[in-house]
């Protein structure tokens, strides 16, 4: 089936975001997911009591993790990644990317906050936002200006969403305070923290901790309530 690119993006948004959001905020399965399940002969073992629990357990606010934006295509290419039947994550040539090919898109955070508020009208908590990178020790120091640049740009876009767009953002926490094994790739060397930990992918190292440049920078950010970036 030939799917227009804009429609492919819409379907991907429904299945990867709205499906979960609608369940938690509205307390019911969205119509597009009911149609998807019916078309494939999927019958959920769910009772009226279960549906009532869904209705009674709706959330008071939305917590989101934002690291990157995704570009969706219905056309498969050599470097695309299949995410579902007929849908692929494609490379966006207009944004930078990390060492792990994650798209660096601060404006996407502002867009996402607007999108979620327009659909759900709930306060939003950005619970994860961070930059995974190879950190190199130089004379006993880690000068991770790339991480500062990433976080600063995303915080600025979040502030625009709050001040210019009126989005009720209730909080922000970066990922993360200290290096640990990446849940996404299983690597220690994909580092997110403000504090460096001497350990490699094979578990070798002293476990010595060292503050990166981003540690002092973020300390000023939170002390000033985001005014000093």
Where do the protein language model's features map onto the residues?
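Active-site region of glycoside hydrolase catalytic domains
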Residues: 1-229
């Amino acid at each position: 089936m030939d799917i227009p690119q804009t429609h492919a993006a819409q379907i991907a948004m429904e299945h990867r975001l709205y499906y979960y959001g609608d369940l938690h905020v509205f307390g019911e399965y969205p119509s597009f997911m009911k149609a998807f399940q019916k078309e494939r002969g999927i019958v959920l073992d769910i009772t009226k009591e279960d549906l009532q629990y869904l209705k009674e357990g709706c959330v008071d606010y939305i917590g989101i993790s934002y690291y990157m934006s995704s570009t969706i295509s219905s056309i498969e290419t050599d470097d695309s990644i299949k995410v579902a039947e007929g849908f692929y994550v494609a490379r966006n040539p207009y944004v930078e990317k990390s060492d792990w090919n994650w798209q660096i898109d601060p404006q996407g955070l502002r867009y996402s906050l607007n999108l979620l508020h327009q659909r759900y009208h709930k306060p939003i908590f950005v619970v994860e936002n961070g930059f995974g990178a190879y950190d190199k020790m130089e004379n006993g120091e880690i000068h991770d200006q790339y991480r500062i640049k990433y976080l600063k740009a995303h915080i600025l876009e979040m502030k625009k969403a709050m001040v210019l767009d009126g989005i009720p953002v209730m909080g922000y926490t970066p990922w993360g305070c200290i290096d640990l094994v990446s849940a996404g790739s299983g690597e220690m060397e994909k580092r997110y923290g403000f504090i460096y930990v001497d350990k490699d992918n094979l578990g070798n190292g002293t476990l010595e901790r060292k503050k990166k440049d981003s540690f002092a920078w973020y300390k000023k950010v939170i002390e000033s309530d985001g005014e000093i970036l």
